[in-house]
Amino acid sequence: MKSVIFTEEKNLQRQNPLQKSEQQRRNFEMPSPPTTTSLSVTQTINGSHSFTIKGYSLAKGIGIGKHIASDTFTVGGYQWAIYFYPDGKNPEDNSAYVSVFIALASDGTDVRALFELSLLDQSGKGKHKVHSHFDRALESGPYTLKYRGSMWGYKRFFRRLMLETSDFLKDDCLKINCTVGVVVSEIDCPRLHSIHVPASDIGSHFGMLLENEDGSDITFNVSGEKFRAHRLVLAARSPVFESEFLDVTGEEDRDIEVTDMEPKVFKALLHYIYKDALIEDAESSSSSGSSVGPSASDTLAAKLLGAADKYKLPRLSLMCESVLCKDISVDSVANILALADRYNASALKSVCLKFAAENLIAVMRSDGFDYLREHCPSLQSELLKTVAGCEEELSGGGGKTRSVWGQFSDGGAETNGRQAQTWGDINGGAERSQSVWVEVVNANGSGRNNNDNNNSDDPMAELED
């Protein structure tokens, strides 16, 4: 044994030192690490908002530093608003200029963004007054708004005397378009493989369960038409069914009589419960915008809205509200408003109130207005508050509200002439800024309408915190 070991050691010693070193290097050499890559992409998420101001002449005189605000709009995950100052923002200018600013209206810190403000030419010539950051290089980069309430804009946006004799003002109306580009950065990593996941098919599976009636354990009798269903499915979807079925034990197959619903409505209700979708007839139902009185209530979507309220199905309610919202018109809004109030459809009610306020004179002259006054007197004050732009209780109590409502509802040719006085009555002497009718139109995408000859380098632009 010793001689063998000695021989092996001798052989090792006889190896060439260079060969031995090369062999050791190969034995201990680590593989080189793989090369990876990543890409940082900085870009802007753009969105536009159009702000129409009706009643410019009434807006003048509200005071220096006081503004009219647009509705808020969302771009890049933040909310924004346009502030228009009819008498200017800077006391030193003595109301010689109008001011326009873009304000960060939601919580956020150090929001970096680009802006564009356009005062639209209403003559059709397309000579808009445009202040834009998008088409030129910024030496110091995008603007940074530090926190909620920070603003960017112009104290001297336009000389007021020139504005009032220009094509930017038409029919006592101004139109301002704003584009915001929020700066975002993200890492773009290459993905070598991807697997597509199809949309959920659970609705189709439960739908087959409803159609085949497999395992059904309850029967609904609706005006002589029978519907088989499954108590567990109904209970899982509706708290009303849950309390009715799961609190009762030891019962076999049951028959339930439904006396307050038509068969087609109950069928649409089950279709939603099992498939989480509106039945096709409900999606296309419409009162065609020309009806008054109760006809809007006769649509399948309207009746299904009542079923959603009865069985506490908020998602179904929103689906029906979305369908009915598309049918709002001057003639139908009063009835749809009453319907929304009856069935606790808050989103639809809000849209109806806003539409009625923006089209008040035309709505007052419709037969639907009489229907609203006769059948839903409790909605009177709510509509008046919306018209006045008040979020708080009206001062003066109900007597004042009824007095104003009487002035509105008597119709006739004098309604338009009485309009400014009535708004003042509603506000109880509040600031005249509330007497301006504001129409807001949201638009996704850039929505820009530039004229290169009117772009300016905006040396007077200001950033305020």
Swiss-Prot record:
GO terms for biological process: cellular response to salt stress; cellular response to water deprivation; protein ubiquitination; response to osmotic stress. It holds the Pfam family MATH_2. It is found in: Cytoplasm. InterPro entries: BACK_BPM_SPOP, BPM1-6, BPM_C, BTB/POZ_dom, MATH/TRAF_dom, SKP1/BTB/POZ_sf, TRAF-like. CDD domains: BACK_AtBPM-like, BTB_POZ_BPM_plant, MATH. Residues 46-180 form the MATH domain. Gene3D superfamilies: 1.25.40.420, Apoptosis, Tumor Necrosis Factor Receptor Associated Protein 2, Chain A (2.60.210.10), Potassium Channel Kv1.1, Chain A (3.30.710.10). Signal peptide: none annotated. Residues 216-282 form the BTB domain. Ubiquitous. Residues 12-40, 395-429, 441-465 are annotated as: Disordered. Transmembrane segments: none annotated. May act as a substrate-specific adapter of an E3 ubiquitin-protein ligase complex (CUL3-RBX1-BTB) which mediates the ubiquitination and subsequent proteasomal degradation of target proteins. The BTB/POZ domain mediates the interaction with some component of ubiquitin ligase complexes. This is BTB/POZ and MATH domain-containing protein 4. The lineage of its organism: Eukaryota, Viridiplantae, Streptophyta, Embryophyta, Tracheophyta.
